[in-house]
Amino acid sequence: MLKRLVILVFVCAVILVVAISPRGVEARKQLTVNRQCCDFSPLQILRMTAREAIGGVTYPSEIGQDKWVIGRMFPGVSTGFFLDVGSGHGTIGSNTKALEELGWTGICVDPFPSHMEGRTCRMERVVVSSAAGRTVKFHTHSGLGGIADSLGKWKAEAEKSPAVELTTTTLGRVLDGANAPSFIHFLSLDIEGAELEALRGVPFDKYRFGAMAIEHNDEEPKRSDLLKFLEEKGYRRVHSYKQDDFYAPR
């Protein structure tokens, strides 16, 4: 009875904030996002909105990937490990900054990172593919850069930026070099069309992932190929929202 009363008071407080507080407009936006982004239960939606609207907690990710990890997949976990491939800007749009603020550690992978001040992840300034030692042409566009042969939806925009030649490595080598744990709680993968090639460089018999957010940008057959590949590795798609598919072990 007491638990139900506490939940009722909590729900009423959130509704009050959303309805009439000075933060109401922003809170309503947060409520809408939380209803759609992360496969939350109704109570989880309210809790997440309360953290943002009342508690002032911020989640920098573009479409709620960090909220999904924190609120849906690993609630209460403060010692998780992540692999952020295509980490880009260290704060704006980051899928892993909020995890670090909870105490998580991890690896950030990006050949041209920016604004990493204050971040604690091990920074690997490399380009990853299915095999190491390949020379690739890489467009350096901030946020949309990637391997020239793999660029998809934003190719025309990315090609406006300078291109450089880089030598590939694999995610397996990155993980081995960092002495990463065999269980990685969260993989964030956003490298503008080269996601499947990067995954082919992971020794899945050595490393397992508890949750994955992988960008697809509605590009076919890339999206379907990603799904098939990950299903063969023992994962299932548990959620989709905007440009990302979300995976967990079967």
Please provide the spans of the model-predicted regions:
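Phosphate/nucleotide-binding beta-alpha loop and adjacent structural elements of enzyme active sites
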Residues: 2-250
